[in-house]
From Swiss-Prot:
Pathway: Lipid metabolism; fatty acid biosynthesis
Name of this protein: Very-long-chain 3-oxoacyl-CoA reductase
Gene Ontology biological-process entries: fatty acid elongation; secondary metabolite biosynthetic process; sphingolipid biosynthetic process; very long-chain fatty acid biosynthetic process
Pfam families: adh_short
Listed GO CC annotations: endoplasmic reticulum membrane
Record keywords: Endoplasmic reticulum, Fatty acid biosynthesis, Fatty acid metabolism, Lipid biosynthesis, Lipid metabolism, Membrane, NADP, Oxidoreductase, Transmembrane, Transmembrane helix
HAMAP family: 3_ketoreductase
Superkingdom assignment: Eukaryota
Organism for this UniProt entry: Aspergillus oryzae (strain ATCC 42149 / RIB 40)
Gene3D superfamilies per record: NAD(P)-binding Rossmann-like Domain
Function, as annotated: Component of the microsomal membrane bound fatty acid elongation system, which produces the 26-carbon very long-chain fatty acids (VLCFA) from palmitate. Catalyzes the reduction of the 3-ketoacyl-CoA intermediate that is formed in each cycle of fatty acid elongation. VLCFAs serve as precursors for ceramide and sphingolipids.
Location in or out of the cell: Endoplasmic reticulum membrane
Molecular-function annotations in GO: ketoreductase activity; very-long-chain 3-oxoacyl-CoA reductase activity
Family listed: Belongs to the short-chain dehydrogenases/reductases (SDR) family.
Length: 346
């Protein structure tokens, strides 16, 4: 009761002209509201822990029978390659879509040598060109297939962190064309078949850059924020048709895009990351505030929960820290470029 007395005294000091009885009622109300707030945050955190470490996701087989197909864009390297290999291991035939034909052939051979019963098809297309003829080829390829899973992995970031005013028009256009138009056009070709079959899974690779305003990666950050909103809206539209839509929120992963080679607790390799994604379909992980989204890798999930539920994504402090980190990365990249330029000139 000492706690309640202090709140009653506080209300008196605020000079709200409340009668003593109403001061007590108000104090009880504030205490109850605060307790509910703390309890709700605690329950949310428990849900996050259960989602990340205990509860399984949906079975991949619920999206299509044996002999059905998975389409993976940006398939030849990094996450795309790993998605292709792990989905093939799960028994899905694979359509590999990426820019470089030779890499697609190499990956196709690797898949069929490891999994003899799995079929593959390949399509070399440059999403940056946004050519109608390429999408017509993709449509002709998938229309004859039972596509159960689409992995929208194709993407591009800035070569190095760069202020928006200094970003080249070519890089800016490529990022928007590949990340946004490429994802939308590929999805629009495949969704009708899934709707007809009343099942399917659409995974789109998101980024913490879409959660956090990211200075020096402004165009990339904006493209991922767009995908966040688009994927959430699409998930609501397609849910009644039996199609699961999920945007995967990811922090850094060892890859050519991130230019990070050494894995750590917070930066997994593609194999570990993809395994977590495919084993946690339908679970929000560390993203309970975002419908049709997930942060399934354990450390990414904990970071996403902290940033979205505790720190807040739009706070000036968080944005400032994010800017400082990318300014440091830019300085190191520019120094490295100067050293390489000096070596070539000698």
């Amino acid at each position: 009761m000492d706690f309640l007395s202090k709140h009653t005294t506080c209300l008196s000091n605020l000079e709200l002209n409340l009668a003593p009885g109403w001061q007590t009622v108000s104090a009880y109300f504030l205490l109850a509201a605060g307790s509910l707030f703390v309890a709700s945050r605690a329950l949310t955190f428990v849900r996050v822990l259960l989602s990340l470490f205990v509860l399984p996701g949906k079975s991949l087989r619920s999206f299509g029978p044996k002999g059905s197909w998975a389409v993976v864009t940006g398939a030849s390297d990094g996450l795309g390659k790993e998605f292709s290999l792990q989905l093939a291991r799960a028994g899905f035939n694979i359509v590999l879509v990426s820019r470089t034909a030779s890499k697609l052939t190499t990956l196709s051979d690797e898949i069929t040598s490891k999994y003899a019963s799995v079929q593959t098809k390949t399509l070399a297309m440059d999403f940056a060109r946004n050519e109608d003829s390429d999408y017509e080829k993709l449509k002709a390829l998938v229309d004859e297939l039972d596509v159960a899973i689409l992995v929208n992995n194709v993407g591009k970031s800035h070569d190095i962190p760069t202020p928006f005013a200094l970003t080249s028009q070519e890089e800016m256009t490529d990022i928007i064309t590949i990340n946004c138009m490429g994802t939308l056009r590929a999805t629009q070709l495949i969704v009708p078949g899934m709707m007809q079959r009343k099942r399917g899974l659409i995974l789109t690779m998101g980024s913490f850059g879409g959660l956090l305003p990211t200075p020096l990666l402004a165009t990339y950050s904006g493209s991922k924020a767009f995908l966040q909103q688009w994927s959430t809206a699409l998930g609501s539209e397609l849910e009644e048709h039996g199609i699961t839509v999920e945007l995967v929120q990811a922090y850094l992963i060892t890859s050519a895009m991130s230019k990070i080679r050494r894995a750590s607790a917070t930066i997994p390799d593609p194999r570990s990351f993809v395994k977590s994604v495919l084993s946690k379909i339908g679970r929000n992980g560390g993203s309970p505030s975002y419908a049709y989204s997930s942060s399934p890798y354990w450390s990414h999930g904990l970071m996403a929960y902290f940033l979205t539920c505790i720190a807040g994504t739009m706070g000036k402090f968080v944005t400032s820290k994010n800017r400082g980190m990318h300014e440091s990365i830019r300085k190191r990249a520019l120094r490295k470029a100067e050293r390489e330029k000096a070596k070539k000139s000698t």
